[in-house]
Amino acid sequence: MATEFTRNFSIIAHIDHGKTTLSDRLLEETQTISQREKQDQLLDAMDLEREKGITIKSHPVAMEYKAKDGNTYRLNLLDTPGHVDFSYEVARSLAACEGAILMIDAAQGVEAQTMANLHLAMDQKLVIIPVLNKIDLPAADVDRCKQQLEDILAIPAEDAIPASAKNGIGIEDILEAIIERVPAPVEHEDKLLRASVFDSVYDTFRGVVSYVRVFSGSIHKGQRIRLFHTNKTYEVKECGVFTPKMTKRDELIAGDVGYFIANMKSADEAKIGDTVTDSTHPCPEELPGYKEIQPMVFSGIYPVDTSDYEALKTAMAKLQINDAAFTFQSESSTALGFGFRCGFLGLLHMEIIQERLRREFNMDVISTYPSVIYQVTKTNGEELIVDNPAMLPDAQVIEEIREPMVKLFIMIPGDYIGDIMALVMEKRGDVTHTETVDPTRVLLTAEVPLSEILVDFNDRMKSMTRGYGSMDYEHCGYRPAKMVKMDMLIAGEPVEAFSTIVHREKAESYGRALAVRLKDVIPQQLFVVAIQACIGGNIIASERISAMRKNVTAKCYGGDISRKRKLLEKQKKGKEKMKAFGKVNIPQDAFIKVLKSGD
């Protein structure tokens, strides 16, 4: 099909605003799928995606549509993940498009995630088609949404298309708007092969399947291709398009969105954002926008049953083949045995990996407290990247520690603004901007350390706003902070599973809370056990577990007080000796209880 009859577009939306439902309706309207194949959330292939109602991997699909002008067009839809953890995948998918449908729930209005993803689309200079979804709901307020479009997003209200994806209202208007407003792809004059990899999946039988958008030239079976960043060459074994199943084609031409298979063994060989070109007639420069994906959040993952270590390693390797952003390396802990230090794009990514380990591989795992990457400058000028408390040097040789910051967009009902501002300040953040979205809602912009939003920020924000708040974030660099390494000592012995890097001002309250939790789960010993939180050599919080009392005078009949005193003195000496040489054996389930209650 000629390039002028091709349209590439994406759908961006906040979670639950109906993005995947709209995709389903478009597939039905264009008769891409038959009635027999119909099922809700068709493009969300993973059970986890259907269950959580989110899109985790990109899902492209080619549709053919006969427009009112009498021409048949090929519409390539790239269904992208909506969550910030996958923003690089979203950016690469958007770069493969010329237009984007911006979905807004007419009952909810503009949400925090809408803003973040719209910024990504505008960075790529895409044509934006606003769609007001769910107009059939009693709570829908179309006029208010149109006002928000103009006030917050600076998009003309008359451009908005009212629709209901669930009931099929406005679907034809959306298809016509794609053809009229989204420009056709433009091919480079030299017609050399340039294609961008925007995703890849691993197939057990065929190896890596790379998803590509062809910008110029063509890809066909038997062709020798080269990838810019690995500089490796491959022979194309198969290429085709998604309908939504993989359908073989003789070639992919400029403007096409499709896939190719070329004997790649892992997702690391087909990096997202890499440029594909012909090995004999390569293009002179790569397509812009490529960057290495860096994990932002780290956590130790250990098997609950230590004999599952090899099975866990195999499971992680299989997940990594499909997910190049997930990293892991072996580590061991005296408390938890052998496990892995894992890197994730963010909290949702971490949750998804853990859930997939449990579901797809039946692995029972425990994860340590999540940490972030710190930049450390030593007094001798040496720069370090620290993602594990054990790697942090002694305080005496540290010149400066810098922590990662995030820009938070929080959309809340105006009544709760005071509570949320207090929460941001409690988390060491600064509110940089407030904007009234409509008479009832406010958009807060704040800068907060990434480590502070890792665990409970979203949950607390949701409960404070009775579930009406929404948030999204983007990374915004590093800033200096007074971070310290806090160790937990149990009977004088440091336990590395509980070591953490915390802010100096929060160390005492965190240490005290952890000591209390440990006191509740560690069984009593025959001697007094001290649980201490310490920074360097200074103890900042302490709890004690009293000794079990054994009645050594029980066998003394009669009233000989000197005999009883002798036995009690002997017991006292024995306890002191035990305290000096005794080791506290902490059962593994105690660690698991503490780590899980700390989630």
Please annotate each region the language model reported.
Residues 1-599:
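Structural and coupling elements of P-loop NTPases
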